[in-house]
Amino acid sequence: MAHPFETLTPDLVLDAVESIGFLSDARVLALNSYENRVYQVGIEDAEPLIAKFYRPQRWTNEAILEEHRFTFELAECDVPVVAPMVHNGESLFEHAGFRFTLFPRRGGRAPEPGNLDQLYRLGQLLGRLHAVGSTRPFEHREALGVKNFGHDSLTTLLEGNFIPKSLLPAYESVARDLLKRVEEVYKATPHKNIRMHGDCHPGNMMCRDEMFHIVDLDDCRMGPAVQDLWMMLAGDRQECLGQLSELMDGYQEFHDFDPRELALIEPLRALRLMHYSAWLARRWDDPAFPHSFPWFGSERYWGDQVLALREQLSALNEEPLKLF
């Protein structure tokens, strides 16, 4: 059976955009996106638009609209974020069975790893994001947890026959040991779940004209604030300590941070590793994935994963990062 995205042709993309009143110039450029499909669409006598077509069956309409409302709330509080465009009071549209949203085109550069000045400004931006995010919970979007990101990911991988038989016992053993330790640290660490970005890697924090702005809130969910912070750090432990200090200096100008949450950095890193592999497995019926990730299923990939999980298990037994 053909995957739904195989029917999403350039003509259909143009028809969708024109169905809500825009006149295209027939130019369509596919952008780098796997979970959804994202296109730059040329518009007659105007700037191009970005059209995002949501993966069928992933989110409910309520969950998508809750993401949009969060983005609008951030924008209303002057947090620099790329918000959906609104047409006739709506931000979520449907055409030929596909749900889609339009965004203004907003380019930029990702932050430089370890740049302390940029980390201070990123901290300010994330503090503002979380100041808004902490005011109320999501109602239609799942939270980040050990079960859905960890145990459910392992179940997907074990039941899907993706791991080579030669490495299956080693992967399953270290994964179960790791999840047990992650659960222990989670239970022992006080933390508060807030609305957060959820996938806050440097590529989703773009700089243009010396100002950072937030993009792609597709994975926003409830979770601990530190989830949006740890991926900003790069390098060895000593480098990360200096970077963390700058990040926190900026962050705490706008929102309080509980330093006890720093103990969750390595558990969250472990969950992200497992969830990424499970994400690839769950999307394998989409032809774009075998084409773009041909190494998934290879002994080398899974051997590297076993090593990475073992390293995470060791990291979980080390002293967590602390603020100066």
Q: Locations of the language-model features?
A:
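Activation segment
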Residues: 56, 108, 212, 220-222, ...
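Conserved NTP-binding catalytic cores of kinases and kinase-like/nucleotidyltransferase enzymes
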Residues: 1-86, 209-211, 322-324
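ATP/Mg2+ or Mg2+-diphosphate-binding catalytic cores
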Residues: 161-162, 278-324
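Active-site acidic catalytic loop and adjacent metal/ATP-binding pocket
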Residues: 35-51, 84, 180-229
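Active-site activation/catalytic loop segments of kinase-like enzymes and analogous catalytic loops
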Residues: 225-256, 272-288
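A glycine-centered beta->alpha junction motif in the catalytic cores
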Residues: 56, 100-113, 154-163, 276-292
